[in-house]
Amino acid sequence: MIVCLDSGNTRIKWGVHDGVKWLAQGAVAHAEVGALSRLVAEWPLPEKVMLANVAGVEAGSRIREQLAAWAPVFHEVRPELRRCGVTNLYKSPERLGVDRWCALLGARSLVDSATVVVMAGTATTIDTLDADGNFLGGVIMPGIGLMLRSLAHGTAALPFADGEYATYPRCTDDAIVTGVIDAQAGAIERIFSRLDDPAASCLLSGGYAEQIAVHLVVRHRLADNLPLEGLRHLALKS
């Protein structure tokens, strides 16, 4: 049994895998890290525990403390130059965010063609894999929630919008929501167009993925918890 933990900016996503399929997945807020103890109560000792952590040393330590008696050895993943069919062409490969690295590995395990890999969470990352598995690079932009909050907090007159997407928005809340979603979808489509590959696809994961996906005009599909898929793939290949 493999346990995969993706410690992100907002939540800790977890998954239990038996080598063939996911048995369970879930998420807890960092403030509720104690809830991870239910893994100890509900599951037998794992063969491997895989951890990807972008939330800092303290967050990683709290996770380890909760699971120490049950999983004394953690395999904490670091970005590498080459692994599982992905070549990391970042200027300094080790400085790529481990969440992005795991998402790329997860995407490559699901699709062997050129792929735009989108993680739509607190931040939105849009990364490109070519058909040979080379990570060409990517962009980081504020996620939907951050964009909405920045307009509410950074202006005197604009609210925290609770509007709906509209082709031609005719109220302020709709105008804000539409602008934010169009910014996200437009960035994805712009980067997708650079691939110039008729077989290319786009994978979207993260809390805002579905909200963006319905407005995309490029070939795409949703993929649950791509970083967990990457951790799973690493565990099975190592």
UniProtKB/Swiss-Prot annotation:
It is an enzyme of class 2 (transferase). Keywords: ATP-binding, Coenzyme A biosynthesis, Cytoplasm, Kinase, Nucleotide-binding, Potassium, Transferase. It comes from the Bacteria. GO terms for cellular component: cytoplasm. Its EC number is 2.7.1.33. One of its GO terms (biological process) is coenzyme A biosynthetic process. One of its GO terms (molecular function) is pantothenate kinase activity. SUPFAM superfamilies: Actin-like ATPase domain. A monovalent cation. Ammonium or potassium. NCBIfam families: baf. Belongs to the type III pantothenate kinase family. Homodimer. Catalyzes the phosphorylation of pantothenate (Pan), the first step in CoA biosynthesis. HAMAP family: Pantothen_kinase_3. This is Type III pantothenate kinase. It comes from Dechloromonas aromatica (strain RCB). The lineage of its organism: Bacteria, Pseudomonadati, Pseudomonadota, Betaproteobacteria, Rhodocyclales.
